Amino acid sequence: MDPEAFTASLFKWDTRAMVPHPNRLLEMVPPPQQPPAAAFAVRPRELCGLEELFQAYGIRYYTAAKIAELGFTVNTLLDMKDEELDEMMNSLSQIFRWDLLVGERYGIKAAVRAERRRLDEEDPRRRQLLSGDNNTNTLDALSQEGFSEEPVQQDKEAAGSGGRGTWEAVAAGERKKQSGRKKGQRKVVDLDGDGEHGGAICERQREHPFIVTEPGEVARGKKNGLDYLFHLYEQCRDFLIQVQSIAKERGEKCPTKVTNQVFRYAKKAGASYINKPKMRHYVHCYALHCLDEDASNALRRAFKERGENVGAWRQACYKPLVAIASRQGWDIDSIFNAHPRLAIWYVPTKLRQLCYAERNSATSSSSVSGTGGHLPF
């Protein structure tokens, strides 16, 4: 026997035995693995409103998703006590092995308390609005329609730092769709072509402009009279009293003047036609009405007879006020603070500047020639 042939056959590889059958190939290929189910596959619309409740308090989106998965809703959390909230958070940690951040524990309680305060404030406002609608007055009955909602300076609460990016990434698409639908619904046509804003199409209905009316006269058509304008200041005073009573009950700082807090309260109470720009714009006209009603009525009649617009009447209201200040030592702030209905309003900057300029003019002219200067209107 040839030894070389023996060694050749010993080390000869049978490659055919190593090739598996095609059917075996198919059996050996593992089936495609399904992607693991997302641990937090709760979409924003399935969070039962928890995303709006928690988003500004630094609570992670996945934490809210786990709370919703346990079956909790906003109404359920609002009706729970602090001890029950602690039990809920402990259950969340034990069942899902989910580590809650310290800030999240405080944030959940803070969000629930803030929502309770908001709901508590809205209930008396609605009741007061319903009761206030029954009171009749002789103001512009035909001009109470079509009020606008103008911007009021609001102090936006800073959102918490934890988990905000996750919230935005998950819920941004849903919010865009909802905001787009709301904007489409809010677009209305401005029916008053000669309004102060002049836009043909806007996102909110504009309030009908004011016209100069005599005392007791009711404006007709799409206009508001001056009696109605002065009535808005009385409403602001009522809203300030309500804000003060709420602040006293809570032990918070009590405002003494009409501030942004009062305008926000009026807006939430449904009186969106009361806003800071408009009320500050005509506050000196209301001051003349309070300090010298006869002079205010005479000025209204004169401008009504001449057919002047409300802008010219507004400018003319400065001069009688400066004359009143000249008779009381030019201290316009003391004049406002001494009057019960004006003490809650800030003195307009232009009125203070006019009093200051006229005082300097009167002082300089009296020292030189003894004659008074003219008001720079």
Curated annotation (Swiss-Prot):
Transmembrane helix listed as a keyword: no
Superkingdom: Eukaryota
Biased composition (Polar residues): 131-141
Site, as annotated: Interaction with DNA: K253, N260, R264, G311
GO molecular function: DNA binding
Similarity annotation: Belongs to the FLO/LFY family.
Name of the featured protein: Floricaula/leafy homolog
Lineage: Eukaryota, Viridiplantae, Streptophyta, Embryophyta, Tracheophyta
Gene responsible for this protein: FL
